[in-house]
C-alpha cells in the first residue's frame, strides 16, 4: 500500500498498543469502514481471504491448511479471516508456540458461528472495534475541544466558527465511510444504499449459510431506521412494522434477525447506565438503538437533504445518532465508555461517558442553539436528584453538545456547551 496516502485514524494508537501487548489483534467492524486500510498500514505482510484471483485460491489454500497462510513477516495481516473460521485457532496456536507479541492482525466484517472456533483466543487475540470515521477524522470537526478534557472537568472557552444546517445534513447523509468523503453529496448518498443492498442480497445468508427472508429483514432494517436513537423494544419494532408496512413478523424472528445484524456489525447500540449513579431510584435497562452509521438510517428512509430540512424531528434523532457515533469513538480512544441514562421519573441524559477512573460526565445533545437552556436545566436537575441520594456520585462535568453553535464555553451554572464540529479526542 502507499503509506504516504494513508489517512490517520483515531484507532491507530490502540492498534500499536495492542500489537505490543498481545500476540494477535482482531480488528472488527462494519464493512467499508477502513479496517483493511488501517490494518495494512500497521502490517508488514498481507494475506487476503476474499481475493477472487485464481477462483479464490487464497481461501482454498487457507481451508486446505490454515498454517500455510500464517507464514510471512510480522505483523501479518489476515484480511476477512471469518471466510475461513479455522484460521482463528491456527493463529491462537501459532501465538501460543512463539510467545512473540504483534505477530498477526486479523480483520473481520462478521462474526462466524462459534461452533466453527474451538478456542476463544482470550489472552492471545485481542479484539478492537473499528467504526466509520468521526467528523474529526474526516476533517469536518476542528477537534479544538477535547472530550477527554471535558470528562476531566476542563474546557477552554473559544470561538469555533459558524455551522450551517445544510452542513450537518450533509455529514449525516454522507456518513463516515472513508471512500465517501470527497464525493459530491448526491453520489455519496449512493454508498450507504449499496451497503444495505449488499447486506440483504449476500451477507445475511453468507454469514452462516442459512437462507433468510430478505423482505422481512429489509422491513426490520427500515423499522430500525425509523427508531434510530430510541429505546424501543423488540415488540415495539414488530408493532411498528405492522403499523407502517402492514406485515406481521413474530417477535422471535425479530430477535433472531437482530442477532444476525449484530454479528454483521450493522448494529452499534448504546448500553444503559445508572446503577452506579444512585441506589434507590429505578433505572431503565433498555439499550438505545443505533445502526453503525446514521447514513444507513438515511438510506433506509430515502432521506434527502430537502426532506430532512422539512422534518426536524427526524433530523434531530439522526443528529443525535451522529453525535453518539463520534462520542463513542472519542471516548474509547482514552479507555472511557459511552452509555445513556433513563429512569422511571422520565429523566433522561442522551449520553453518559464513564472514564477508566469511574468518573462520569452527563451529556445532552441538541441540534439548535435555542434548545441549550432547556438541555442544561435538565442535566442540572438530574444531577440534583442523584446527589440527593445517599450514595449519589457527583459528575465530573455536564455538557450540552450542539449542532448550530459557534462557540465552546462554560455557562454560569457550570454546564459546558460545545459544538459537535469542534469536538475531538
Show which residues each predicted segment covers.
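N-terminal pre-Walker A segment at the start of P-loop NTPase domains
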Residues: 1-16
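Conserved lysine of the Walker
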Residues: 35
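Hydrophobic positions on the alpha1 helix immediately C-terminal to the Walker A/P-loop
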Residues: 38
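Short glycine-rich substrate-engagement loop in P-loop NTPases that contacts/grips substrate
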Residues: 46-75
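Conserved catalytic/switch belt of AAA+ P-loop NTPases
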Residues: 88-110
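Interdomain motor-coupling "hinge/lid" segment immediately C-terminal to the ATP-binding subdomain
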Residues: 115-230
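Accessory nucleic acid-recognition modules appended to NTPase machines
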Residues: 185-359
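Domain-level recognition of nuclease-like catalytic cores that cleave nucleotide substrates
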Residues: 403-425
Amino acid at each position: 500500500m502507499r503509506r504516504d496516502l494513508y489517512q490517520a485514524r483515531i484507532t491507530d494508537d490502540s492498534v500499536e498498543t495492542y500489537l505490543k501487548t498481545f500476540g494477535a489483534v482482531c480488528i472488527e467492524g462494519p464493512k467499508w469502514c477502513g479496517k483493511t486500510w488501517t490494518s495494512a498500514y500497521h502490517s508488514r505482510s498481507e494475506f487476503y481471504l476474499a481475493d477472487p484471483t485464481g477462483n479464490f485460491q487464497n481461501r482454498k489454500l487457507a481451508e486446505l491448511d490454515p498454517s500455510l497462510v500464517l507464514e510471512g513477516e510480522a505483523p501479518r495481516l489476515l484480511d476477512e479471516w471469518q471466510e475461513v473460521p479455522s484460521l482463528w485457532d491456527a493463529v491462537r496456536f501459532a501465538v501460543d508456540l512463539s510467545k512473540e507479541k504483534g505477530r498477526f492482525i486479523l480483520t473481520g466484517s462478521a462474526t462466524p458461528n462459534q461452533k466453527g472456533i474451538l478456542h476463544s483466543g482470550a489472552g492471545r487475540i485481542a479484539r478492537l472495534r473499528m467504526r466509520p470515521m468521526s467528523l474529526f477524522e474526516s476533517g469536518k470537526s476542528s477537534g479544538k475541544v477535547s472530550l477527554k478534557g471535558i470528562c476531566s472537568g476542563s474546557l477552554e472557552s473559544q470561538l469555533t466558527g459558524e455551522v450551517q444546517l445544510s452542513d450537518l445534513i450533509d455529514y449525516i447523509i454522507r456518513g463516515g465511510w472513508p471512500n465517501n468523503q470527497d464525493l459530491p453529496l448526491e453520489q455519496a448518498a449512493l454508498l450507504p444504499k449499496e451497503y444495505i443492498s449488499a447486506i440483504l442480497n449476500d451477507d445475511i445468508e453468507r454469514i452462516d449459510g442459512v437462507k433468510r427472508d430478505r423482505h422481512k429483514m429489509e422491513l426490520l432494517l427500515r423499522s430500525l431506521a425509523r427508531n434510530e436513537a430510541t429505546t424501543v423494544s423488540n415488540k415495539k419494532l414488530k408493532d411498528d412494522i405492522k403499523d407502517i408496512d402492514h406485515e406481521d413478523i413474530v417477535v422471535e424472528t425479530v430477535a433472531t434477525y437482530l442477532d444476525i445484524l449484530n454479528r454483521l456489525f450493522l448494529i452499534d447500540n448504546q448500553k444503559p447506565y445508572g446503577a452506579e449513579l444512585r441506589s434507590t431510584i429505578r433505572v431503565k435497562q433498555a439499550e438505545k438503538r443505533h445502526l453503525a452509521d446514521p447514513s444507513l438510517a438515511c438510506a433506509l428512509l430515502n432521506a434527502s437533504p430537502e426532506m430532512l430540512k422539512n422534518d426536524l424531528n427526524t433530523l434531530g434523532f439522526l443528529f443525535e445518532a451522529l453525535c453518539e457515533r463520534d462520542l463513542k469513538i472519542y471516548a474509547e480512544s482514552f479507555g472511557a465508555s459511552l452509555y445513556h441514562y433513563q429512569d422511571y421519573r422520565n429523566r433522561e441524559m442522551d449520553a453518559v461517558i464513564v472514564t477508566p477512573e469511574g468518573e462520569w460526565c452527563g451529556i445532552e445533545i441538541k441540534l439548535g442553539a435555542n434548545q441549550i437552556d432547556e438541555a442544561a436545566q435538565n442535566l442540572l436537575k438530574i444531577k440534583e436528584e442523584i446527589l440527593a441520594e445517599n450514595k449519589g456520585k457527583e459528575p465530573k462535568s455536564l455538557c450540552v453538545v450542539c449542532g448550530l453553535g459557534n462557540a465552546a464555553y462554560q455557562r454560569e451554572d457550570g454546564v459546558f456547551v460545545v459544538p459537535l464540529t469542534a469536538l475531538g479526542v
